[in-house]
Amino acid sequence: MSKGPKSIILFSDGTGNSSAKLFKTNVWRMYEAVDLGPPAEGKRDQISYYDDGVGTSSFKPLTLLGGAFGWGLQRNVLDIYRYACRNYRDGDDIYAFGFSRGAFTVRLVVALIASEGLVRSSSEAELDRKSRAAYHAFRATFLPRRLQWPTRLFRRARAVIGAWVGRLRGRAAYDPADNCRPPIRFVGVWDTVAAYGGPITEITRAIDNWIYPLSMPNYQLNERVLRARHALAIDDERDAFHPLLWDEVHETALIKAKKVDERRLEQVWFTGMHADVGGGYPDESLSYVSLLWMMEEAERAGLRTLTVVKDRFVALASSYGPIHNSRAGLAAYYRYQPRKIAAWLDPVDKKTLSLRDPAIRDSRGRSRGLLRCVNVHESVINRIATGTDRYAPITLPETFRIIPPQLEGENAPQADNQTPVPPPQTTTPQPMVSREVRARLTEPSTAAARAAVTEPIWNFVWCRRLTYFATLTATVLLLLLPLFVARLPTPPLLADGRTWIGGIIRLLTLVLPAFASKWVEVYADNPFYFFLLAG
């Protein structure tokens, strides 16, 4: 490795995602695509660090805690931060990529670097101590929104005890003035979601409000970040997985003050569910679309990637790929709530107030949005216009801006068995849809007509939400049935008086764990109430 400046590239994967998983995410694919070999003359060396997502512990209780409440987030943040501290030298560039809660993680890492800088150390023990001190100083502004004094008291006691122990051991107190404060060259994230992900939003929000602060104090992008890109999913239907956007209202103020470049931040929406955009499903063709967009944006910021790896991604990308069901199986217990993108727009549309995060407010305490405009990738329009599945997302707002495809996107010319040598590459991206199609979706009169047609469909969304709550209530009653079944009136007997149905229910003991036998016996003895709730 040369002794000149280098690029440090940090990766944090999503919940339950790791290098050992069979189906990879875009974070892992980006990690694979980074060129870590000897650079050409005048280019930088590149080193990278990949961190498994939260909820990947081999100890299952920790896996559940990580999946529901972000347990292990601090460890992930500090692991990535220490790698940057350990390897940074003056003049180095820093890149960071993440998906889902891994996106939340790298945004915290970037905010930590921008706020506290990178600590200097001469040993791993010193690095461990200083990095924890930097993290605690950074987290000082993270407080429960309602009940704050217990958190303040605990942190004050921890600081006093830590300072006392440090003096006994002859250690200097943590001083952020000793840290180096590099700019962040590029941050690329896919569909950032909150650190907690329980299916009942009120429970996780109550923890954040009253017990332990997990959310960010704000959604502003620090001025030390030179470029940031956010790929977002249009079609996910889980309330707990609504994305954490960057604050474009604050960004506009920075641009007007000429503190940042006007193209510094870009957030673009893509077809698909959460993992259709960030990756992780067996059929992965749709996720490559946002990956190629992110790769090209990072390359413009100086990142070097391997052509042989990227060519494979280009060949496999398809905006016509299958859209999966984000609420399949047990995920059906995540609250049903499609992403109404208009709810994030500023100024506020009063019709969307019930869908907004109540914590997002202006300096006067009034609810406000985070988006100035909605950017939709042209691949979305291509699927709407020419797709084979009648794709028509109801979540798009009335007006939006179409982002043209990248130069090496899914429509880039490729070699095949008929054309062994691909056509020459052009210097401008090839459009995916005609001007007429673009105009038909964005022209004011047709946009208003489209919005008028899709708005009544949200009435069916509310009906499905009622169905969700009915299902959740029936499930809870079914689980609690052994506690109150003795108080219920005797149900009507079957017409022929037979009780064979209980024997069939008892067959469940053959496939369920032993601790479930108590419930199975109650259900078998009370088949009327079992089928009333389960049916």
Question: Where are the model-predicted features located?
Answer:
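Active-site- or binding-pocket-proximal scaffold segments within functional domains
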Residues: 1-535
